[in-house]
Amino acid sequence: MGGARDVGWVAAGLVLGAGACYCIYRLTRGPRRGGRRLRPSRSAEDLTEGSYDAILSAEQLEKLLYLLESTDDPIITEKALVTLGNNAAFSTNQAIIRELGGIPIVGSKINSLNQSIKEKALNALNNLSVNVENQTKIKIYVRQVCEDVFADPLNSAVQLAALRLLTNMTVTNDYQHLLSNYITGLLHLLLIGNGSTKVQVLKLLLNLSENPAMTEGLLSAQVDSSFLSLYDGQMANEILLRALTLFQNINNCLRVEGRLANQLPFAKGSLFFLLYGEECAQKMKALACHPDVDVKEKALAIKPKF
């Protein structure tokens, strides 16, 4: 290998920590021009512990992606994904990673049976998805991620990572339709998940609820009657406020479409029957006296719709 190529390989090794650094060293252990070897200016541990805040160059990212694509070592794979994910938080690198063909390389890792690797891949895709152009490439993974959300261990880090990616991918209306067949499953996950899972599912549903094109799909989704427990006065505010906003958004979309909720044909057991039923009306009435001002205002805004 030439001197410039050796530098690139060693730089990539530095990024990945002690284990990956050794791997790269083995690949480049031959002498450089002049018989000298490149010595790292900083410890590899600094680069993987979050104390190294430099943005990687395009050349370093290219070597990192090559290593990620070619290695079978789970430790190196995980370190590479973490490093790529951290660098994907920078807008400049979001474009560079796409242009280097990095999105399919990262995306392939969500198929890993190693839950930690899968989580890190989802986190990296999540950061990359902030870039609108990147979303056009990430969209091919949306349906798989939806399927995996329901198969992943409940309340696990990998499940939350998947939900965060789906939330980012539904900030705009462009890809929300890809989730149409998964709304019932998301509502079920909302009910059985812990507080963190509930909040993340609600963030995702809130994105969908702002789009009039998704309103009918939301209201027709089958959901257990325990959904109304989200509107109990003792529910944590971070959940209660989002659940109320979900209801508000649906009402707003119906108004934009010039439709009345009671004119829409939905089956029993649907979200429609719960939101516009007598039990929910009573809950809104009770929340209108809630001590939290924000909760009270939202409940009062919803109450006249009954």
From Swiss-Prot:
Subcellular localization(s) per the UniProt record: Endoplasmic reticulum membrane; Mitochondrion outer membrane
Taxonomy, superkingdom: Eukaryota
GO cellular component: endoplasmic reticulum; endoplasmic reticulum membrane; mitochondrial outer membrane; mitochondrion
Main location: endoplasmic reticulum
Residues modified as Phosphoserine: S43
Keywords noted in UniProt: Endoplasmic reticulum, Growth regulation, Membrane, Mitochondrion, Mitochondrion outer membrane, Phosphoprotein, Transmembrane, Transmembrane helix
Pfam families assigned: Arm_2
Entry-annotated residues carrying Phosphothreonine: T48
Entry keyword Oxidoreductase: no
Subunit composition and interactions: Interacts with the DNA-binding domain of p53/TP53.
Protein name, UniProt field: Armadillo repeat-containing protein 10
